[in-house]
Structures are given as C-alpha cells and as structure tokens.
A protein has these predicted regions:
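Positively charged n-region of N-terminal signal peptides that target proteins for export
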Residues: 1-4
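Sec-dependent signal peptide cleavage junction
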Residues: 15-33
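Serine/threonine-rich, repeat-prone extracellular segments and beta-strand-based repeat modules
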Residues: 79-124
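Beta-strand-enriched, solvent-exposed domains that form extended recognition/catalytic surfaces
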Residues: 111-117, 121-254, 575-617
C-alpha cells in the first residue's frame, strides 16, 4: 500500500533593513504563482515612499501633520496595489521645541508581509534653516511585453507629486541623492503654453526648480516622472531618493488621496486658494484648477457624489481595460505580465480636439478639467487610446477604432458604467444601417469610425465579446515575442483560427479587407469551418428567418458557418470573375468549388464571368 507524502510548510519570519525601511517578510506558499519568473510573489513586501526624512525650522509650523502633503508617506504593494489608507503610524513632533523626533509607519499586505519605516524629523533653530525633505520615489518594473507591441497606456507618464504647490515666481532647490538615471520634473498648469520641464541630474547637482516660460513665471504643480527599470532589473523594491529645500513661500499642495477626508480637503483648499490641487489613486491623478473645485462632485448630470466614487470608477475602468488587454499581475506567460501605472489627467487650454491622449497624459482641451469628472464616452475613449498598440494600427485602419473596442465593452457593462448610454448602439438595431455602405461597395477603410467599430464588435460577439480581444492580444504578444511581423488584419485572421478554430477570411473579405496570400494559404490549408455574413449568404427571407429562429440568432448580418446553413438546405448564388488576358486559353477546363474536403460543385469555364446558381452551403 502506498503512503501519502505529507509536506509540512514552515513559515519563517525575517527582519531585513534596506535604506532605513524594515520589512518583516512572511514566506507564504508560492503555489498561487502561475509563472515562476513573473513579478508576482507572496514574498513581495510593500514599499513606503514619500517624505522619508524631514528638517524644519522651529516655529515655522503650528503643528506637524502626517497628512500634510509636504511630509506625507504612501504605500504600495505589487500584488495589492495602493495601501496608503492601510498605513498605521505612531510618534509626535513638537514644532516649537528643537530636537530629533521619529514617526514610525507600518503597513501590511494581504500576504502578511509587513514593512516598517522610521521617518526622522529634525526641528532646528538655525537662523538660515529652511524646510528640507528627502523624498523616496518608487520605480516601475519593465513593461517590455507591452513595449514590443507599442501599448503605452501611461506607462512612461506615471508621475509622483512632491507635496508642494509653486506660486508664481517661487522656486525650490532639488537634487538627486540616489538614482542611476536622470529624473524629469514637469510643472503642470491648465495650459501647456505656460509650463516647462527640468531635469535633475543623477550626478547630484543642485537645481533651482521654477516654472518660467519665455521669461514669465506661472504657478504650477511640480510632478516628477517615475523611472522605468530595464528588463534585467527585477527588483520591485528599488527606490530612488531626492532632496528638496525651500522656504515658507512654497505652499503645501492641496492634495486628496483615495479614502482621505474629502470635507477636510475641500475646506483646506478653499482656505488656501491655491490655483491648482491634485487628486489621485493608484491608476489616475488629476491636476485640478481651483475654478473646478466645486465641479468635481455633484455637478454633472452623469457625475459622482464623492471623490472616492470618481476614483473607484476609474480604477474599475483601468482594471477592466487591463483585462481586455489580456494582462495579469499573476500571469501564466511572461508576455502577459501586468504592471500598475498611473494616468495623468489635466486641463490644457492649447490642446487638441475636445480631448486628447499623447502617450504620457490625457488632456482636456480647455482651461477646465471638469469634463473628466463625468461618466461619459470621452473619458473611456481617451484612456483606451493608450491600449491600442500595433494591433490597433496598420493596413486595416483602426486609429480611432481599436480604443473604442475597449470603450464599448466597458460602456455596456453596467457594473462599471452605471449610467445609461451606448455609443455604438445595440448590434441588431444598427446592423442595417452599418452594412449599407459595405453592400454599396465601400471598403472597410472607407467606412466611418462607428461602422468600423460595428464590424469588429460583430465579429467578437460571435465568440466571447471582449474576452476575444483579450485572447487575441495574448496570442499577438506571443507571436511578436517569437520574432514574427504581422499586419493587423492577418493577425486577426490567424488569431481567430488558432484560438477558436474558425476561418474568418470570408467575413474580412466581405468588408474588402485584404488578407495576404501567405495567410490565406495557411488558413485554408487548415480546412477549418468558415464564417461568413448570414444575410450575404441567404437571400430567401423565409430561410433567413428559419435560421434566425432555429439558431437563436439576433442579427441578420451575424456570422454563420456552412454547417449551420446546411441544416436548413440553404442555397445561394456565386459570381466568379476570372482575370486573365485571354480567357479562351481556359475554355473547357473546370473549377471545383470546395468546402474543406467536400466538392460542392464543378463548373466549366466558358467565359471570364461565371454565375454559379443554387450553390449549396
């Protein structure tokens, strides 16, 4: 008799110290990990970042507040995301008594990994003392798998605040204490024509930071762009340090972080009257002009009751878009690795269109960012531009379409998009209109944006809707990683064939989308079921209705296979055009029309145009 082997797991507690941060790491079971080389791990401890060493002049502050944006810390965890609201702290600072003080911060993730951080606060009475803050900055792991297919999201536009608001004419000094790359500081206003960016050198030189454009100073919110690590550097705890020095003319940033006290935030901003404030969670940060302060909540028809509701909505949106991209924090394949990054949303009086996406931020073309505080199609459309990549570009023109695919599947998901609204419309209600131009001979690239989207959604909905897009992205990344080069239309055809074992070339060609000869040969040699447009194939209305009812199909222009048509003895006519200089050379020869291995009909060539009638499915 065989005996069962019982494995006893021992949990070991290790206390480690890195850059003054203590991590109590609980080595839990890694059985949940889907790929041993992915970033995901039960052993990953949270990191604490923000103001990690502080010096202030005696009496410059009435009191020390750990929520003061200048002195605040935050926490994030690769698996759990933002943990800032989970931070616990102890310790006090007497701002009127010279001395060294300590604030201890502690945060624990869902795998019971604990990170502790002691922040030293020095109160000095030196005459020329200024506020001095050392800030720890997080870094972002490589997103090589998204880079290789051109999916940028806002990966290289993730920014961290410095806790300050710079009034017009006010400057600060800054330098890098520890980083192996230069860092970029950008001043955000509500007009790109009123802002610049500056670079902090990794050599540690002090830089005077001030937003002066063409000799004119402007108030602004300085943000520093998060560094993205190389593929070889997989240290998720890697941080950089910078040092800031400034006087009392530099203002505390009016700042709201997810789950903060909204009333306190609004009251403080009303009191300060700073020209800009900042709200954020782990997926989105918005620089808000003072004029929009009362337009963020309870203002728009499709607006939000609280700032947390707003931030939660965009968290759901971005999470869902990541799912539609086919990426995961705990992937089975490394090509599907996800990494959390944050979108910057801003007003820009000199932007483009109504709103725009430019790779490192989303802008509202106005001096107001208020429009982004409403649940609407525009927000989905612009955020999703970051997800297009090379699969959304190419000969099959999807420039303003690939992003709308994501927007569509989110908008019809009423667990996320809770207001009424469907930019595309119900497929069975719009299909006659959307197929009109196609049947008149227009190519896919000649269609309007809405019709192009309809064509894709009609295809995806035959399978698994948005999940089909996710599976296609997974397939596509794997192909590109293996060194292949594909047009987007060939990628669509090959992906559907490999994933679902169907040939969609007839559907693609019905929209006059050109598939390469190489791909045609490859797919037709598979002898897999072909999918075509139902109403294109069946002209008899009685037969059409029998198929619709019998197969529980809602769309006349939905996709069907020949096997389905055979069940209803459907027949159709086929027009063949032979392009040759002298068709007489082919007289007497025959053409076999086949479906897989079955010969449906044999016709003799006697003209350059041949009409085949009553062709069985």
């Amino acid at each position: 008799m065989k005996r069962k082997l019982v494995i006893v797991m021992i949990i070991v507690m290790i206390l480690s110290t890195v850059n003054g941060i203590q991590r109590n790491i609980v080595f839990a079971s890694e059985q949940e990990k889907n790929n041993e080389n992915s970033y995901w791990s039960t052993k990953n401890a949270p990191i604490i970042y923000g103001a990690t060493k502080i010096t202030i002049k005696k009496g410059i502050l009435d009191s020390f507040d750990v929520k003061d944006a200048r002195f605040r810390v935050f926490a994030k965890d690769f698996e759990d995301g933002d943990l800032t609201d989970k931070i616990k702290y102890s310790g006090t600072v007497d701002t009127n008594t010279v001395g060294e003080y300590k604030i201890t911060y502690t945060v624990q993730d869902s795998h019971n990994n604990i990170t502790n951080l002691d922040v030293k606060v020095y109160v000095t009475d030196e005459e020329d003392a200024k506020i001095n803050v050392e800030r720890t900055l997080y870094t972002i792991p490589s997103m090589w798998n998204l880079d290789m297919i051109g999916v940028m999201r806002c990966n290289y536009g993730d920014r961290q605040n410095l806790g300050i608001y710079l009034p017009e004419g006010v400057s600060i000094k800054a330098r890098i204490l520890n980083a192996d790359t230069d860092l970029r500081v950008q001043y955000i206003t509500n007009d790109a024509n009123k802002e610049i960016s500056q670079t902090l050198s990794k050599n540690g030189d002090w830089v005077t930071l001030q937003n002066i454009k063409d000799g004119v100073g402007y108030s602004s919110v300085p943000l520093i762009t998060s560094a993205v690590l190389s593929k070889e550097n997989t240290d998720l705890t890697k941080t950089y340090k910078i040092e800031l020095e400034y006087d009392e003319n530099v203002k505390e940033l009016n700042y709201y972080h997810y789950k903060d006290n909204e009333e306190n935030f609004m009251n403080k901003w009303e009191q300060d009257q700073n020209e800009y404030g900042l709200i954020e969670n782990e997926v989105i940060q918005v620089v808000v002009p003072l004029a929009d302060k009362d337009k963020m909540t309870n203002y728009h028809r499709n607006g939000f009751a609280t700032l947390d509701q707003y931030l939660e909505y965009y968290k759901k949106v971005v999470d869902r878009m990541d799912e539609l991209l086919g990426v995961s924090l705990n992937p089975e394949k490394l090509t599907d690795q996800n990494v959390r990054t944050k979108y910057l949303i801003r007003a820009n009086a000199h932007g483009a269109g109504a709103a725009y996406y430019n790779g490192n931020h989303v802008g509202v073309n106005s001096s107001s960012v208020s429009a982004f505080f409403e649940m609407n199609w525009g927000g989905l459309h612009e955020i999703a531009h970051g997800y297009q990549g090379s699969l959304g570009k190419g000969e099959m023109q999807l420039g303003e379409v690939a992003n709308n695919i994501l927007g569509h599947y989110i908008q019809i998901d009423k667990s996320i998009y809770t207001y009424s609204g469907d930019w595309l419309g119900a497929i069975n209600q719009i299909e006659e209109n959307k197929n009109k131009a196609r049947l008149e001979g227009k190519t896919y690239n000649e269609q309007d944006v809405s019709t192009k989207l309809y064509m894709i959604v009609n295809l995806f909905d035959h399978f698994e809707g948005g999940e089909t897009y996710a599976k296609m992205f997974k397939w596509y990344r794997e192909q590109i990683n293996n060194g292949r080069t594909l047009t987007n239309q060939d990628a669509y055809v090959e992906a559907i064939a490999d994933i679902y074992n169907f040939n969609i070339i007839p559907y693609m060609e019905s929209w006059k989308i050109n598939i390469s000869e190489e791909t045609k040969i490859k797919i037709y040699e598979k002898n897999i079921p072909m999918l075509g447009v139902l109403k294109d194939t069946v002209e008899d209305e009685d037969v059409l209705n029998k198929i619709l009812n019998g197969e529980n199909i809602n769309e006349k222009y939905g996709l069907v296979t020949n096997e389905t048509l055979k069940k209803y003895n459907a027949v159709g006519n086929l027009k063949l055009t032979i392009k040759i200089d002298d068709v007489k050379k082919l007289n007497g020869k025959t053409i076999k029309i086949i479906d897989g291995n079955n010969v449906l009909k044999t016709v003799e060539i006697n003209n350059s145009v041949i009409l085949v009638q009553d062709l069985p499915a």
